[in-house]
Design a protein with these regions (language model features):
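Short, solvent-exposed amphipathic alpha-helical segments in soluble enzyme
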Residues: 23-25, 73-76, 100, 134-139, ...
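Thiamine diphosphate
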Residues: 1-110, 117
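Short, well-ordered, mixed-charge alpha-helical segments that flank or form enzyme active sites
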Residues: 67, 91-94, 128-130, 156-160
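Flexible, low-complexity linker and terminal segments
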Residues: 141-272
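Conserved thiamine diphosphate
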Residues: 99-153, 176-180
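Short, small-residue-biased leader/transition segments that mark boundaries at the very start
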Residues: 273-277
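Short, glycine-/Ser/Thr-/acidic-enriched flexible segments
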Residues: 13, 63-64, 89-90, 125-127, ...
Length: 277
């Protein structure tokens, strides 16, 4: 529904059902499914396909999520839209491959080195899995940003009857494309909202992109502190500009309560009912 047309992944419990499902579904809608040799390669393939213009997805669990961190950092620095699903399991290391946990929340936020923001969405129901998947792709394309869907083994295996909206009613956001000429275009020159526009690959636009600190033209400037400060400030600011679109929560109970419990994913399933008035 969100327009995903490329998946690269490596089977890992308890996220393998996503890989299996995409292997069946994507060819039916003209998409591409790739089973890669490992988690690092699958992250790199998703980044590359997104750079070429596709809406991309990859899925994994704890050990694979660790291996994808460098790629997530690259996507953040190069401002490449990509959705990463982490179906959490118990850890550390190989951990408990078939049992649930919520142990990856800190890694989801601070798993990469360097100072960059990240968007994390955490569904608690099958309906939210559907809705937040669409939201993840929309935010990734709108803000040019990797987005993590933080699920878990319980939520990932839930079966519920839900009502799906008509496809015509689903809001789908595509990436902004430049209106400037190839001579004027700079791949990292931001618009008013702090987000640069893309240019079509395979067209007259020829430009450079790298994961170093870079100029608006995309060339390395990794010894220039002024360029680095300006770039990092913009990477943070563009998310702040869309804070209202990113942030979402549900409140249960009385607003004059003395105790506030914050929950997400599987834990929300267990505490939402007891906290109702």
């Amino acid at each position: 529904a969100a327009g995903a047309r490329f998946f690269a992944g490596y089977p890992i419990t308890p996220a393998s059902e996503i890989t299996e499902g995409m292997s069946v579904r994507l060819p039916l809608v003209g998409g591409v499914f790739l089973q890669m040799e490992d988690e690092i390669a699958s992250m790199g393939a998703a980044i590359g396909a997104s750079m070429a213009g596709a809406k991309c997805l990859t899925a994994t669990s704890g050990p694979g999520f660790s291996l994808k961190q460098e790629g997530i950092g690259i996507a953040s620095m190069m401002e490449i839209p990509v959705v990463i699903v982490d179906v959490m399991r118990g850890g550390p290391a190989s951990g408990m491959s078939t049992l649930p946990s919520q142990m990856d929340v800190m890694q989801a936020r601070w798993g990469c080195h360097g100072d960059h923001p990240i968007i994390v969405l955490s569904p608690a129901t099958v309906t939210e899995c559907y809705e937040l998947a669409i939201k993840a792709f929309n935010l990734a394309e709108l803000i040019r940003q990797p987005v993590i869907i933080l699920s878990d083994a319980i939520v990932g295996h839930l079966r519920e009857r839900i009502d799906l909206p008509d496809p015509s009613e689903v809001k789908v956001i595509d990436r902004k494309m430049t209106t400037k000429s190839p001579e004027e275009y700079a791949p990292f020159e931001a618009e008013e909202d702090g987000v640069p526009c893309f240019a079509g690959r395979g067209t007259a636009y020829r430009y450079h992109m790298c994961s170093n600190v870079h100029t608006e033209k995309g060339f390395p400037a990794d010894t220039n502190h002024a360029v680095a400060s300006k770039l990092l400030a913009r990477l943070h600011k563009k998310l702040e500009n869309y804070e209202d679109e990113i942030t979402a929560y549900k409140f249960f109970g009385s607003e004059d309560c003395e105790t506030l419990i914050v929950a997400y994913g599987l834990s929300l399933i267990h505490i939402s009912e007891p906290t109702r008035p």
